[in-house]
């Protein structure tokens, strides 16, 4: 196997692996934690259940549908860019970093595509004794496709 094919296979495998890990963690949090709850892992690391309506830090630029289409465009562009960098012989470390960014962006597309369809809306208020979210019948969640 030549070097470019090896890099391409590594990039694709890393993206798929990170997407699986990302979704497994998000589903575990959504199904086992209440909004605002946190789990202490180390002094410097905790998992906290927060929900974000927009982009990073809750920024909102236009509608959720616009954001979803922007994400799709960005992931397609990033995959095209990674492919081009592989063909030009970029270092593996650079390909790995780009693949990680691509996996994160693709995970956000999956979230907006699916989560609004399968989960009820989370309450922003702490309710004593609240139970974690449950799955709903497909299409009966809190938002239409690409707007979750």
Model regions and ranges:
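Alpha-helical transmembrane bundles and membrane-interface segments of multipass inner-membrane proteins
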Residues: 1-148
């Amino acid at each position: 196997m030549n070097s470019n094919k090896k890099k391409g296979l590594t990039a694709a495998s890393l993206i798929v692996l990170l997407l699986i890990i990302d979704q497994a963690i998000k589903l575990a949090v959504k199904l086992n934690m209440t909004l605002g709850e946190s789990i202490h892992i180390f002094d410097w690391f905790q998992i906290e259940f927060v929900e974000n309506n927009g982009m990073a830090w809750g920024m909102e630029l236009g509608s959720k549908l616009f954001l979803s289409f922007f994400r799709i465009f960005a992931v397609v562009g990033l995959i095209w860019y990674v492919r081009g960098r592989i063909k030009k012989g970029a270092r593996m470390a650079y390909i790995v970093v780009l693949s990680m960014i691509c996996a994160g962006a693709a995970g956000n597309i999956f979230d907006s595509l699916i989560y609004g369809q399968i989960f009820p809306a989370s309450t922003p208020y702490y309710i004593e004794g609240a139970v974690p979210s449950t799955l709903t019948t497909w299409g009966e969640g809190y938002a239409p496709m690409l707007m979750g």
